[in-house]
Amino acid sequence: MRFSWYILAITLLTVFVVACGGTKELPTAQELPSAVSDDKSVATQLDPISKNTDSSAIQPIVAAKEKEFGSSTQQGSLNEKVLADASDAVNGGSLIRLGSDPPTLDPHVATDSVSIMYINEIYGGLVTLDLDLNVVPDLAESWEVSDNGRTYTFHLRPNISFHNGKPVTASDVKWSFERVSDPNTQSPVAETYLGDILGVQDKLAGSSSSVVGVEVIDDRTVSITINEPKAYFLSKLTYPTSFILDENSVTESDDWMLRPNGTGPFRLWEYETGEVLRLSGNEGYHLGAPYLDEVEFILAGGQGMLMYESDEIHLTGVGRADLSRILDPNEPLNSEAVQAPAAFSVAYIGMNVNEPPFDDPNIRLALNYAFDRHTIADVVLEGLRIPAQGIIPPGFPAFNPDLDTYTFDTEKAKQLVRDSKYGSDLSALPRITLNVVGGFGAPVDDDIEAIRRAWEVELGIIIDIQQTAWATFLQDLHDRRYQMFKVGWGADYPDPENFLDILFHSSSDNNHSSYNNPQVDALLEQARVERNQDTRFELYNRIEQMIIDEAPWIPLWNSGTESYALVKPYVKGFYMTPMSIPIHRYIYIDK
């Protein structure tokens, strides 16, 4: 959800992603709206679109750009790249790019990638992810873990402060965890990301007034105790649910989010809904002040390519309509193309297994076998996406290339329908409505139209489609109001628990399909506490296969392996990663 529900889309191919218990910008583990169009892109920080075509014409340029930008087909360590380039960095200037209005700027309730992109720049937590996706110190300068693996003792950096200069203390850490766990905060992701901490679930349930697992030792020391040792716990603390807020700022004003007092590399300087969101650099940032004076996000809309070519914005993703031109070595813009890594995300159609006809696994399986993912990806999506074979995306920890998954098999699909409780009498099937993100009267995405048509032709099953605005869709999704829905999930942190446990454990708030398998639950719980990584990943491979066999999802697409963005030649230090993390402090303008 960054929804981790993570929205991958800000400028080009729109796939709405939910990450981290929510949604995020893709490419977050976050959930994303899943749409594919010529004008929208879904990918990493910039949302470039990918295309699996012969790109030999652009490869020499891409290779050169990789040295400059750290875009990761052969990037090595981006951290080393940042250090090597620091001596050339120039202070000052503004970066201008397209953006979208955030559903919220409260870190403790955010579940979408658009919100999280801004929140990541304004706030911070005890730890963060670096450009190589390692967990590294943020507000904490160091920590120790007890011998039993359950207690983490964090030592805060000296002289860290909020944007207004107020010192950050261990009491602020304690208060922030208390706030996110307060039922009145109504965080949809607190239990998902913080439920391992002793006392969080009790406070969420209203049976305790405090989170006993978070203890202030002194002004610069705080301990966090979890219920069982878990290899991924530190990674969870990089999600905005764990970000540290200023109690005075939050409690003194109902509109505190419009004047947030964070600890991040940027301050929120201006926000006009539907017009502009402007971030200004925090010169006192404890990890190093940003080079930029400000980052301006244009929220009024516009076509990215046209705005880029007229020098209204400094970077944009490349969509279907423009990709061939950009790949042409005779095109002037070819020299400004940058290759980006594939996002750690998956677009899918979810089915509520408690709602007929999806309470019958034969129907769920039949729909998975009744359309040709490869043809739709190659022809309809023009190679901009690759067919998803399962839940965990390629390149992600515990990805299983040998997963026994779905193929296009019409006869098998028809037999599965006959084997269902509905038999051959399709008139007995309940009406099926697929909910997708979109505006009233807007055209349905080409991939969904193709899939719907395939189901009608191959099986005689007719699907109605209902479009809903993203904010409403997200709330209804969390409330499990949908029989069938198309969305996406982007990684919040690099651990398979972020996909399999958060999305499929029967107790998870993000289990929008209401999937419930006691054997899967037991294996997920076993994987949580397994300390041997190889054994953990073997468990997750087994779990993923069990879920695929029962088909609560229809996996659709992963991000392509060749994604492109356009970046002005004087914009330096723009590093793209497979996940949504803070990146703007590394950027500088050199002209």
Regions flagged by a language model, labelled:
Residues 22-93, 136, 162-174, 178-226, ...:
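Surface-exposed, Gly/Pro/Thr- and Asp/Glu-enriched linker/hinge segments
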Residues 80-86, 99-117, 139, 166, ...:
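A structural "hinge/loop" feature
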